[in-house]
């Protein structure tokens, strides 16, 4: 899109947002143009907290469907819009509610800690929700004699098992972006840029995490890079975060690792996140849809597990 078109659309979006008393929340994995127009940018935990405290009449969530669902669960009387309702999540899709409910029935005595990257229905069948930045803190509060069932990300679960020295029952889900990085490409890049810090999201497989200098949530990765100006960084997460990293560390250099199939680094963009565009954002503010709606019973059940997260963090 031409710069002049971006400016024009951005102006219209700001006008519509003010006119409708709307707040625009955007995840770090959104396109830079959307990040720049948002009222608030953050990771899943930060966006959840912002959704819980907003006084706006309308919440426009520039992220994926499960994130907009969380905003609706927290604010059942507010209108929640998602620029593209098809913006799903491969990780959330890897754990369907029917199978998860049966899985829970097989492990009735377990405490179910579910990653926020999950559907409202799965959250409804869970005890506690967590994010990548809050998971360790939550797990450490569970009594040692209680078995934990962790879903849906097996790589995040494995990372947390090592961090907490706590064996858990793991659901075998994965994120299509974080499991796609090539270890060979990473090692080659580390050789070429031997002074670079390797920063990884814990949704990455262990063969990538073991090469990393720092592992954390998107916000934690952002903080790490901001505290080390004029440095080099190899990034093992969705490349949308680099837009904010460059803003906070303009003198630093950031590298993106290619994918397993040898494809271009642009394959590390989440295709679901990128379904949201400035044009769709403008249209949803103008028309008041697509709107996220939820079954009341499911929403109330899911809110209990989200409230447990907020209480423990």
Swiss-Prot record:
Annotated localization: Cytoplasm
Keyword Nuclease attributed: no
A Pfam family per the record: NadA
Cofactor or coenzyme needed: [4Fe-4S] cluster
Positions of [4Fe-4S] cluster binding: 89, 175, 270
Pathway where it operates: Cofactor biosynthesis; NAD(+) biosynthesis; quinolinate from iminoaspartate: step 1/1
GO molecular function, one term: metal ion binding
Cofactor note: Binds 1 [4Fe-4S] cluster per subunit.
Binding-site residues for iminosuccinate, renumbered to this chain: 27, 44, 115-117, 132, 201-203, 218
GO-annotated biological processes: 'de novo' NAD biosynthetic process from L-aspartate
Entry superkingdom: Bacteria
E.C. number(s) listed in UniProt: 2.5.1.72
Main location as per UniProt: cytoplasm
Swiss-Prot/TrEMBL catalytic activity: iminosuccinate + dihydroxyacetone phosphate = quinolinate + phosphate + 2 H2O + H(+)
The UniProt record lists the keyword Iron: yes
Keyword field: 4Fe-4S, Cytoplasm, Iron, Iron-sulfur, Metal-binding, Pyridine nucleotide biosynthesis, Transferase
GO cellular component: cytosol
Family (UniProt): Belongs to the quinolinate synthase family. Type 2 subfamily.
HAMAP family associated with the record: NadA_type2 (MF_00568)
Function per UniProt: Catalyzes the condensation of iminoaspartate with dihydroxyacetone phosphate to form quinolinate.
Protein name per Swiss-Prot or TrEMBL: Quinolinate synthase
Taxonomic placement: Bacteria, Pseudomonadati, Pseudomonadota, Alphaproteobacteria, Rickettsiales
């Amino acid at each position: 899109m031409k710069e002049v078109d971006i400016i024009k659309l951005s102006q219209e979006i700001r006008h519509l947002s003010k006119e409708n008393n709307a707040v625009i929340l955007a995840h770090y994995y959104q396109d830079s143009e959307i990040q720049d127009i948002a009222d608030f940018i953050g990771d899943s935990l930060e966006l959840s907290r912002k959704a819980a405290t907003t006084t706006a009449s309308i919440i426009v969530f520039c992220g994926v469907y499960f994130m907009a669902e969380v905003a609706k669960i927290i604010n059942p009387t507010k209108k929640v819009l998602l620029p593209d309702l098809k913006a799903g999540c491969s990780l959330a899709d890897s754990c369907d509610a029917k199978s998860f409910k049966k899985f829970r029935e097989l492990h009735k005595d377990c405490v179910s800690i579910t990653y926020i990257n999950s559907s409202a229905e799965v959250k409804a069948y869970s005890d506690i929700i967590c994010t990548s930045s809050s998971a360790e803190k939550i797990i450490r509060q569970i009594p040692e004699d209680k078995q934990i069932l962790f879903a849906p990300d097996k790589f995040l679960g494995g990372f947390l098992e090592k961090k907490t020295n706590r064996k858990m029952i793991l659901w075998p889900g994965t994120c299509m972006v974080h499991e796609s990085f090539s270890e060979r490409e990473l090692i080659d890049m580390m050789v070429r840029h031997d002074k670079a810090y390797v920063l990884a999201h814990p949704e990455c497989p262990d063969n990538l995490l073991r090469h990393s200098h720092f592992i954390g949530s998107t916000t934690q990765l952002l903080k790490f890079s901001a505290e080390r100006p004029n440095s080099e960084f190899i990034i093992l997460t969705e490349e949308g975060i680099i837009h904010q990293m460059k803003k906070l560390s303009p003198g630093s250099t950031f590298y993106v690792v290619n994918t397993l199939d040898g494809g271009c680094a642009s394959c590390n963009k989440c295709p679901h996140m990128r379904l949201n565009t400035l044009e769709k954002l403008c249209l949803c503010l103008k028309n008041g849809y697509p709107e996220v709606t939820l079954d009341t019973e499911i929403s109330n059940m899911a809110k209990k597990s989200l409230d447990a997260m907020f209480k423990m963090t």
